[in-house]
Curated annotation (Swiss-Prot), chain A:
UniProt name for this protein: ATP synthase F(0) complex subunit 8
One Pfam match: ATP-synt_8
Region of interest: Disordered: 35-55
Subcellular location: Mitochondrion membrane
Role played: Subunit 8, of the mitochondrial membrane ATP synthase complex (F(1)F(0) ATP synthase or Complex V) that produces ATP from ADP in the presence of a proton gradient across the membrane which is generated by electron transport complexes of the respiratory chain. ATP synthase complex consist of a soluble F(1) head domain - the catalytic core - and a membrane F(1) domain - the membrane proton channel. These two domains are linked by a central stalk rotating inside the F(1) region and a stationary peripheral stalk.
Transmembrane segments: 8-24
Recorded topology in the membrane: Single-pass membrane protein
Lineage: Eukaryota, Metazoa, Chordata, Craniata, Vertebrata
Curated annotation (Swiss-Prot), chain B:
Source taxon at top rank: Eukaryota
Subunit relationships: Component of the ATP synthase complex composed at least of ATP5F1A/subunit alpha, ATP5F1B/subunit beta, ATP5MC1/subunit c (homooctomer), MT-ATP6/subunit a, MT-ATP8/subunit 8, ATP5ME/subunit e, ATP5MF/subunit f, ATP5MG/subunit g, ATP5MK/subunit k, ATP5MJ/subunit j, ATP5F1C/subunit gamma, ATP5F1D/subunit delta, ATP5F1E/subunit epsilon, ATP5PF/subunit F6, ATP5PB/subunit b, ATP5PD/subunit d, ATP5PO/subunit OSCP.
Record's protein name: ATP synthase F(0) complex subunit a
Functional description taken from the UniProt entry: Subunit a, of the mitochondrial membrane ATP synthase complex (F(1)F(0) ATP synthase or Complex V) that produces ATP from ADP in the presence of a proton gradient across the membrane which is generated by electron transport complexes of the respiratory chain. ATP synthase complex consist of a soluble F(1) head domain - the catalytic core - and a membrane F(1) domain - the membrane proton channel. These two domains are linked by a central stalk rotating inside the F(1) region and a stationary peripheral stalk.
Source organism: Anas platyrhynchos
Biological process annotations from GO: proton motive force-driven ATP synthesis; proton transmembrane transport
């Protein structure tokens, strides 16, 4: 059964860990989760106008 | 003839180069690395949803200290999942059927969980060697048994993944061979065998996903004991 043959085990291990650490992990890190959609209307701020002192 | 069914598991070479490298690297292409300025599309949304779900499921039983492992466990799950699923395509090679690859993943990660426990809270992780409320005469035997079960974990982890995927691929090949061989003699039985093959393929897709999840889930359970 060839799948039990550990022949190039070191290169397989190095390749597996390099793929995991250098390819998959940086890829997953770039995914940014968004907030779940909410029904609440976003708060609208109404700034009160003011007069500049020099006008 | 007896051995030829296992030939699908031998690592293929092309011009002296092992193709296992390609089959390790290619599944990563399924996941893009979206930049900040990317517009969401359906694919990236569903991938994001899946990653979020996996991370949430894995992190729920762990306490706050274990959440540092989120990236490690989620990326391991993603890698195993993509390799397992792409390996189900016909005429492809599945690296996760190789015992050496699974042990290369299982052993260091198991050792990491163990060393984390022994470094941060040695007495609590050593206390797992004896279940609470054991009768006194049983204590030496139980400690021996629990030590063995602790040390056998990485082996079980690697062999589980190998055995499940190997068995699935073998069954698919056996049934499809039977279906081809029966076609000239018993067409009806051959069609029935094809139906079974279809059902088996659905089962194998499920097994590919479940085994990737089980591998990571067991690692997170070992982590939970030690953190």
């Amino acid at each position: 059964m060839p799948q039990l043959n550990p022949a190039p085990w070191f290169s397989i291990m190095v390749m597996t860990w390099l793929t995991l650490a250098l390819l998959i992990q940086p890829k997953l890190l770039t995914f940014t989760t968004t907030n779940p959609p909410s029904k609440k209307p976003s708060l609208i701020t109404k700034p009160t106008p003011w007069a500049w002192p020099w006008t | 003839m007896n051995l030829s069914f296992f030939d699908q598991f031998s690592s293929p070479h092309l011009l002296g180069h092992p193709l296992i490298l390609l089959s390790l690297l290619l599944p990563a292409l399924l996941f893009p690395s979206p930049g900040n300025r990317w517009i969401n599309n359906r694919l990236s949304t569903i991938q994001l949803w899946l990653l979020h779900l996996i991370t949430k499921q894995l992190m729920i039983p762990l306490n706050k200290n274990g959440h540092k492992w989120a990236l490690m466990l989620t990326s391991l799950m993603t890698m195993l999942l993509t390799i397992n699923l792409l390996g189900l395509l016909p005429y492809t090679f599945t690296p996760t059927t190789q015992l050496s690859m699974n042990m290369a993943l299982a052993f260091p990660l198991w050792l990491a969980t163990l060393l984390t426990g022994l470094r941060n809270k040695p007495s609590a992780s050593l206390a797992h060697l004896l279940p609470e409320g054991t009768p006194t005469p049983l204590i030496p035997a139980l400690i021996l048994i629990e030590t063995t079960s602790l040390l056998i974990r990485p082996l079980a982890l690697g062999v589980r993944l190998t055995a499940n995927l190997t068995a699935g691929h073998l069954l698919i090949q056996l049934i499809s061979t039977a279906s081809i061989a029966l076609k000239p003699i018993l067409p009806t039985v051959s069609i029935l065998t094809m139906a079974i093959l279809l059902l088996l393929t659905i089962l194998e897709v499920a097994v590919a996903m479940i085994q990737a999840y089980v591998f990571v889930l067991l690692l997170s359970l070992y982590l939970q004991e030690n953190i």
